[in-house]
Curated annotation (Swiss-Prot):
CDD domains: HCP. It catalyses: A + NH4(+) + H2O = hydroxylamine + AH2 + H(+). Pfam families: Prismane. Its cofactor is [4Fe-4S] cluster; hybrid [4Fe-2O-2S] cluster. Keywords: 4Fe-4S, Cytoplasm, Iron, Iron-sulfur, Metal-binding, Oxidoreductase. Its EC number is 1.7.99.1. It comes from Caldanaerobacter subterraneus subsp. tengcongensis (strain DSM 15242 / JCM 11007 / NBRC 100824 / MB4) (Thermoanaerobacter tengcongensis). This is Hydroxylamine reductase.
Length: 549
């Protein structure tokens, strides 16, 4: 069976995966994901019409964000999950049609739109249709490129909206925009210029969604504060929490209190330690390991069970597969799943009992790392930072936010961080930080040279900080600040962060280790001419370029 997927940075030969994903996704799963997205586009088209006549159901909003999130790289690999979701999507689509008919809307007028009208009899029908609706069904290379750019941005937006929703925060305008964007990528009358404008609008709603999630996280758990995080281990059994979901972590910490089981973060969960609300748990020990792609070795050594709350999951080895638990929209065939109850709560008793039977984690490193430099904390230090800039103690900031990945060429980011002059400061968020957050880069007048704002969505914090500095220095343009952008990307959440930065007017962003495979030459040319987007070359030449040497 054939597939075509080029949504992540590791797309084969920077062109696309055609038989199996570099991520481990099989062709049938890739195609089913395409069909789910296709059907969500149909649902979006219909739900916009339903909104016009006063019909909008909460379950449609939730289904949309969960469906989109499940197709992000390294979230869900389970064929049966996608078959089930597609059937649910068709049922929901038909329910919205019925609601429209009851309101007097002539739904038959839309029967020529395949995303709205396709049907199935058997699973084999679903499999067959799934092979016809993928990325390559758009023939024009530039239109295809822009449609995918927008779709991947909306996937990233959906992930952030999902996390906010889990904490009880929702903005109907964001859901409306996601539906609008997905409906418009079905519209063959739109031009390249139309889609460029829609991509910028996607960036605008990306900012709004990250702001909403920031509000959800900080209202629930307090503002991140400067925190030293232990990277060693204790002599108790433990549970390792990976992904991004703070609510799952909170529930697990509550349920493990007094059990003798320690809880550790992994990967993108590291920033949980920065929130005041999580500091009251004495059994919340520290962070274990590094970025997602090293999990095959680190999960093995951890000895205890692992809870995957979101991406990034890689296909687990048999040696530890029985210790992996998934929840939310994460899935992998043969791995245990912890569902959400009708009350929104999760019962973690099985994973806790499992942990009690396990040996303590193997120590892989010791010491501490520092983080918690989100916008509220950094703005408390604003006077000190401004003074350091004015005196020349800080000459330049480098935003090195984003994602980490497997490619050997990503050692560039470690070498780049090491080579930066001592009068520069790195601003980071996301798992890209693991390439340099354990280096001893020192400080400038007490300001650490690596300021970690948090998870990938906390790139929003970096934008807030930049806007505030622009205001303090009385500048007209954000690009007049002594800030350079050298961003590492991997999956679709990085796409919405990029579009958000472009919407905010940030120019001359450098993206690596490769430019996205889904950007056609012409679309790349537009981004270069309009926004100064660039790639990376080597540390020495790039430093000269950034520093104007």
């Amino acid at each position: 069976m054939k597939m075509f997927c080029y949504q992540c940075q590791e797309a084969l030969k920077n062109t696309g995966c055609t038989t199996i994903g570099v991520c481990g996704k099989t062709a049938d799963v890739a195609n089913l994901q395409d069909l789910l997205i296709f059907t969500l586009k149909g649902i979006s088209f219909l739900n916009l019409k339903a909104r016009e006549v006063g019909v909008n159901k909460e379950k449609t909003d939730r289904f949309l964000i969960e469906g989109l999130f499940s197709t992000i790289t390294n979230v869900n690999f389970d064929r049966n999950f996608f078959l089930r979701k597609i059937k649910e999507a068709v049922a929901l689509r038909d329910e919205i049609k019925e609601d429209l008919r009851n309101k007097g809307v002539r739904v038959d007028e839309y029967k020529n739109i395949d995303a709205i009208s396709w049907t199935y009899g058997t699973d084999a029908d679903i499999e067959a249709i799934s092979q016809e609706v993928g990325v390559l069904s758009t023939e024009d290379e530039d239109i295809r490129s822009l449609r995918e750019l927008i779709t991947y941005g909306v996937k990233g937006m959906a992930a952030y909206a999902y996390h906010a929703y889990q904490l009880g925060y929702k903005d109907d305008n964001i859901f409306k925009f996601m539906e609008k964007a997905l409906a418009k990528v079905l519209d063959d009358s739109l031009t390249v210029d139309d889609y460029v404008a829609l991509a910028m609008e996607t960036g605008k709603y990306g900012v709004d969604t990250m702001a909403l999630l920031d509000k959800a996280n900080t209202s629930t758990y307090g503002h991140p504060e400067i925190t030293k995080v232990n990277i060693g281990v204790r002599n108790n059994p433990g549970i390792l929490v990976s992904g991004h979901d703070l609510k799952d972590l909170e529930q697990l910490l509550e349920q493990t209190a007094g059990t003798g089981v320690d809880v550790y973060t992994h990967g993108e969960m590291l920033p949980a330690h920065y929130y005041p609300a999580f500091k009251k748990y004495p059994h919340f020990v520290g962070n274990y390991g590094n970025a997602w792609w090293q999990q095959d070795k680190e999960f093995e050594l951890f000895n205890g069970p692992i809870l995957m709350t979101t991406n990034c999951l890689i296909p687990p080895k048999d040696s530890y597969k029985d210790r992996v638990y998934t929840t939310g929209v994460v899935g992998f065939e043969g791995v245990k799943y912890i569902p959400e109850g009708p009350d929104g709560k999760k019962d973690f008793s099985e994973i806790i009992e499992h942990a009690k039977r396990c040996k303590p984690p193997v120590e892989i490193e010791r010491g501490e790392i520092i983080g918690g430099f989100a916008h509220n904390q950094v703005l408390q230090l604003a006077d000190k930072i401004v003074e350091a800039v004015k005196t020349g103690a800080i000459k330049r900031f480098f935003v090195m936010a984003g994602c980490d990945g497997r490619m050997k060429s990503r050692t560039y980011y470690t070498e780049f961080a090491k080579a930066l002059p001592k009068d520069t400061v790195i601003l980071t968020a996301g798992c890209a930080k693991y390439r340099y957050n354990k280096l001893n880069l020192g400080d400038i007048d007490g300001i650490p040279r690596v300021l970690d704002a948090g998870q990938c969505n906390d790139s929003y914090s970096l934008a807030v900080i930049a806007m505030k500095l622009k205001e303090i220095f009385g500048l007209n343009d954000i690009n007049e600040l002594p800030i350079s952008y050298n961003i590492a990307w991997y999956e679709q959440k990085a796409v919405i962060v990029l579009l958000a930065l472009l919407y905010l007017g940030v120019k001359n962003i450098h993206l690596g280790p490769t430019l996205p495979a889904f950007l056609s030459p012409n679309v790349t040319k537009v981004l270069v001419e309009k926004f100064g987007i660039g790639g990376i070359t080597n540390v020495e030449d790039d430093l000269k370029m950034f520093l104007g040497a």
